[in-house]
């Protein structure tokens, strides 16, 4: 009996304990296992695969139900903050691209070009990217759920939500209950994050190591340094301009609870449930974050803008092409537009590099070699990119919600 109660007490402590501390323990154990036994580390990679698979499985249903329930139960006259969040997303992405241009000129990198992959096809132009985004809006809803097409899911969720506004209260309550049930499943999956990250870290270190990355040390330093600058300086400045108080407690909370998980899952879509849970913890408006978080996972791509810009300018420096200031500014705009469409392209930000390279007349075969370099450094580049993208979704959502709360409180005091 005593053993059972002790076991129950241990499980209770694990279930109610700090998730961040448990993730750090999983991280350390994963590194140790990869160091001690590569075969065992590769074997436990299944735990990471299962965790990421569970997150990807629950995320589309979560987005559909939350957005649908939010709009169906939206009261007339009740205000959401989607527009200011959209502006923050766009400003953050463009600022990241500008920062990447500045870093690339201050610390010019060159590439050891390798054979590019021939079995992947990049988009043919920005028009092609925008066309793919528009087509994803009219996707079959079942197909959108199966493939994780969040633009299509959002369109259907918004449409069904507006249609259900005219339904009776029983129907609306059912939608709310379904939303709560999916949220419960999400919380259950997130509790397994320490085990999942343990498996991901162990298998990644065991299979790839970091030996191949040393040849691209400077390029990685420019990429990661730029992402750190955006996360710790540029984004806090944008948030400060919005909320008019110290932004760093909010910034560090988002990096700690969203960025860490996103770093290891390397998937903005898989991190949507984590971000939703963090928004709830921050007591943000559910009607707002249920739309802004999946939307951010689709279009808020500061990390992708940095990757596209830095790798393109590295190719430019390698080939000795001169770049003036207006062209660099135009590259920032192009990289921002490409980044916003990265979620609709198989291969993400890397396969949009040929679009940016095309601005400088770089042939497609060389551009695809740059893409191949991107895949080589992807272990770190993609992890940092996803961590920046996903944590910024919560950061800007929280900033807009808190600014609106402060405005309403100030208005109430004046009256």
Swiss-Prot record:
Molecular function (Gene Ontology), one example: neutral L-amino acid:sodium symporter activity
GO cellular component: plasma membrane
Tagged with keyword Flavoprotein: no
Major location category of this protein: membrane
Localization: Cell inner membrane
Catalytic activity annotation: L-serine(in) + Na(+)(in) = L-serine(out) + Na(+)(out); L-threonine(in) + Na(+)(in) = L-threonine(out) + Na(+)(out)
InterPro entries registered for this protein in UniProt: Na-dicarboxylate_symporter (IPR001991), Na:dicarbo_symporter_sf (IPR036458), Ser_Thr_transp_SstT (IPR023025)
HAMAP family per the UniProt record, alphabetical: Ser_Thr_transp_SstT
Name recorded for this polypeptide: Serine/threonine transporter SstT
Species this protein is from: Cronobacter sakazakii (strain ATCC BAA-894) (Enterobacter sakazakii)
């Amino acid at each position: 009996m005593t053993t059972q109660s002790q076991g129950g007490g241990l499980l209770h402590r694990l279930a109610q304990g700090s998730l961040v501390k448990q993730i750090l323990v999983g991280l350390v154990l994963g590194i140790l296992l990869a160091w001690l036994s590569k075969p065992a580390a590769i074997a436990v990679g299944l735990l990471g695969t299962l965790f990421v698979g569970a997150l990807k499985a629950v995320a589309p249903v979560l987005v559909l139900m939350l957005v649908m329930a939010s709009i169906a139960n939206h009261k007339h006259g009740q205000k959401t903050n989607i527009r200011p969040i959209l502006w923050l997303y766009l400003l953050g992405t463009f600022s990241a691209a500008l920062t990447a241009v500045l870093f690339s000129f201050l610390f010019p990198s060159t590439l050891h070009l390798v054979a590019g992959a021939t079995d992947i096809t990049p988009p043919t132009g920005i028009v092609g990217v925008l066309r793919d985004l528009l087509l994803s809006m009219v996707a079959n809803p079942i197909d959108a759920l199966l493939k994780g097409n969040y633009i299509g899911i959002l369109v259907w969720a918004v449409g069904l939500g507006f249609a259900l506004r005219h339904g009776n209260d029983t129907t609306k309550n059912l939608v709310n209950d379904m939303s709560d049930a999916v949220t419960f499943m999400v919380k259950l999956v997130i509790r397994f994050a320490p085990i999942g990250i343990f498996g991901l870290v162990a298998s990644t270190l065991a299979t790839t190591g970091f030996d191949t990355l040393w040849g691209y040390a400077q390029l990685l330093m420019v990429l990661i340094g730029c992402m750190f600058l955006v996360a710790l300086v540029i984004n806090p400045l944008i948030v400060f301009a919005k909320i008019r108080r110290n932004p760093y407690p909010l910034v560090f909370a988002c990096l700690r609870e969203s960025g860490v998980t996103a770093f290891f899952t390397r998937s903005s879509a898989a991190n949507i449930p984590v971000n939703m849970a963090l928004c709830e913890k921050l007591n943000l408006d559910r009607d707002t974050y249920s739309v802004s978080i999946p939307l951010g996972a689709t279009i808020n791509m500061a990390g992708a803008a940095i990757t596209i810009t830095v790798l393109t300018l590295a190719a430019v420096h390698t080939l000795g092409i001169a770049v003036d200031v207006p062209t660099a500014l135009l590259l920032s705009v192009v990289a921002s537009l490409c980044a916003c469409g990265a979620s609709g392209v198989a291969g993400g930000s890397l396969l949009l590099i040929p679009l940016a390279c095309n601005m400088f007349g770089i042939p497609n075969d060389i551009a695809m070699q740059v893409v191949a370099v991107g895949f080589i450094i992807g272990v770190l580049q993609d992890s940092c990119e996803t961590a920046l993208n996903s944590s910024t979704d919560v950061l800007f959502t929280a900033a807009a919600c808190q600014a609106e709360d402060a405005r309403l409180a100030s208005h109430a005091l004046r009256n």
